[in-house]
Amino acid sequence: MIPITSFAGKTVAVFGLGGSGLASCQALKAGGADVVASDDNIDRLVEAAQAGFITADLHSVAWSNIAALVLTPGVPLTHPAPHWAVLAAQAAGVEVIGDIELFCRERRLLAPDAPFVAITGTNGKSTTTALIAHLLRQAGFDTQMGGNIGTAILSLEPPAAGRVHVVEMSSYQIDLTPSLDPSVGILLNVTEDHLDRHGSIEHYAAVKQRLVAGVPDGGTAIVGVDDDFSATAAERVALDGKTVLRLSVKRPLANGIVVENNAIYRVTDGEREAIARIDGIGSLRGLHNAQNAAAAAAAVLALGVDREALQRGLRSFPGLAHRMEQVGRQGETLFVNDSKATNADAAAKALSSFEEIFWIAGGKPKTGGIDSLAGFFPKIRKAYLIGEAAQEFAATLDGKVDYEICETLEVAVPHAARDAAASELVDPVVLLSPACASFDQFRNFEIRGNRFRELVTALPHVEPVV
């Protein structure tokens, strides 16, 4: 835990008592603050009270006695409208912040020179965060990883000299961190997402930009420039006098980090210098993972990891569950769990990464269906359709891709395995990349992915991928 001493002797309200909210309560109390815990969910209020915290309805508190409102990222700060607790705090002149802001303030008090790596982007931020932490640990660094990736930041060990905090940040978390100042900041990409919470793509992009804009002098701001919004962010941050390390996996750069033929290069005034290779690394397959790997490589090199350690770390990276996770191999057939692909754009990244595909798709359909994936249809040997989207996807595939309506994973997995084995293709892939939400049959994509893994490992003669 990171005790938060910057509010010692003051009263702090915490609204939203999920994992990060309860961790904030504990950290503030440990640092000497008086905590008032609140939530719209009565069960969470009961849980907080049982944990020893004072609970209250913030409608009735004396805001003049409150030093700050710590808000969980899931509660609207601006769009579609500020939550009532936010409006009440703002009306009283009380600052509204999040748990990562508490971390930033404590770091400046305890160990201002301790490395702090912050990562954001519409896609790839979890993989990049996990990869950076893996590379640092493999190189012998004392490394703490948390934030949006799943572990509340205030549950980690405190900032200390020589200890690196690697933190994934969503746009919601950035919005709640006004003094964000990572020593290494990474913006991977910006595409349309979460517009219900930001109002427009322009506002969403501006929030993402703040992460790299906050990098202090002497730090490293890394920005992927393969989309227009991120490229604009790089220009704006550079105009403010910051040093920006641009990154591209799609085009040459005169200065920055580029990826070509599975090699990562540092380019200075047009001169290229190879820093790592990612060919043959199954967990980093695909152009999107090339961007993740290049950003991670640039980050750890900036922190002092040498190139030999970087290459060893890349080759030993196991990847993240449900993100092009290599579950097993049955003879020549590779089974890949990409359950995190809950829309067509995400599924495209997996479909672009393999050639002989036996595709398991479907679930609760998203707007737009799979029409945008037509360019990948020639790579799909057969599709196995599940869930509510099965009939809709069948209509799209009809006459273009052989398909079977399976309804469930329990039917789709053995049928796909049978057909892949009988195909006599070189390196066939049974790919779960649903292009759909999971909620028609599973509570979340993790449970869907876990079920796929169970079904695959229950098949005869399946071996782990090494």
From Swiss-Prot:
Entry GO MF terms: ATP binding; tetrahydrofolylpolyglutamate synthase activity; UDP-N-acetylmuramoylalanine-D-glutamate ligase activity
Keyword Lipid metabolism: no
InterPro entries: Folylpolyglutamate_synth_CS, Mur-like_cat_sf, Mur_ligase_C, Mur_ligase_C_dom_sf, Mur_ligase_cen, MurD
Gene3D superfamilies linked: Mur ligase, C-terminal domain (3.90.190.20), Mur-like, catalytic domain (3.40.1190.10), NAD(P)-binding Rossmann-like Domain (3.40.50.720)
Binding site for ATP: 121-127
Reaction(s) catalysed by this chain's protein: UDP-N-acetyl-alpha-D-muramoyl-L-alanine + D-glutamate + ATP = UDP-N-acetyl-alpha-D-muramoyl-L-alanyl-D-glutamate + ADP + phosphate + H(+)
Keywords from the named record: ATP-binding, Cell cycle, Cell division, Cell shape, Cell wall biogenesis/degradation, Cytoplasm, Ligase, Nucleotide-binding, Peptidoglycan synthesis
Main location (coarse class): cytoplasm
A Pfam entry, by short name: Mur_ligase_C
Keyword Ligase: yes
Homology family: Belongs to the MurCDEF family.
Functional description taken from the UniProt entry: Cell wall formation. Catalyzes the addition of glutamate to the nucleotide precursor UDP-N-acetylmuramoyl-L-alanine (UMA).
UniProt protein name: UDP-N-acetylmuramoylalanine--D-glutamate ligase
Taxonomic lineage of the native organism: Bacteria, Pseudomonadati, Pseudomonadota, Alphaproteobacteria, Hyphomicrobiales
Gene: murD
